[in-house]
């Protein structure tokens, strides 16, 4: 009964923009998002990506939000993606925590940002309650799920926190939410299996996997070895185009030398770490910025454009990729 009520609440809240459909695997819930059709090119999808932001407007969070609103309007975005660590320092203490409104509702006020927010879970948070949608209907945060944007793009959100082994041995700095994770090994094994199944079944032109922790990064935390060992091989084997993450408070673009995967870090939504850069393993590095900012993504059937912006809305880095259009006969 409890699960039925949960799905009912989600279904009622998402009816205007997305709809719930049957799971493609045992654990990954699936949502259908119908983007606005633009032009006569078969449609397109545009969205912004922001991470590590929730500080009640401080540390330039409000300035980043302002520029997100400007870019969002110019691109006529369909939705916003958050890569996690949404409320500092240790997430929300409950559904009625004022930090939700002070760090989200009252900060991202631009008209262009009044769209669906698909939100990944950070490493020290508890904001999964569907009751939060009664406060702000834009909010959707689950551990792991799939968003299908008109079969042009599929976004696979992965809860990466249980992969990080030190979180189970060093709990002094943060309070971790392990509800539903009785055994990390079993949980991550099942999640990887479900993700692999969903990726194999996907017919989307663009496959995008989103997690909080970086696979590749030269920022403060660097590479997440557990993800390099366990998650990356699945992405490489299933033609994933982009892996997007936060965790490191910077903006980054690194190319995978063994596949077409682009590693994109957007974790600069508020407090950034100036000068905190690792000198080792810079293979494939295209761009790094240690200030605040965000990222935009534009997708069509044949083209993708990734743009990084700073706190003033200035373009820092742009990456364009083309794909052939294969027509069914």
Task: Please place each PLM-identified region on the residue numbering.
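Cleavable N-terminal signal peptides of Sec/SRP-targeted secreted and luminal proteins
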Residues: 4-19
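Generic enzyme active-site microenvironment
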Residues: 50, 83, 120, 210, ...
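Short, well-ordered beta-to-alpha junction loops that form the rim of enzyme active sites
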Residues: 160, 210-214, 247-248, 309-310
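Short acidic, glycine-rich surface-loop motifs adjacent to enzyme active sites
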Residues: 202-219
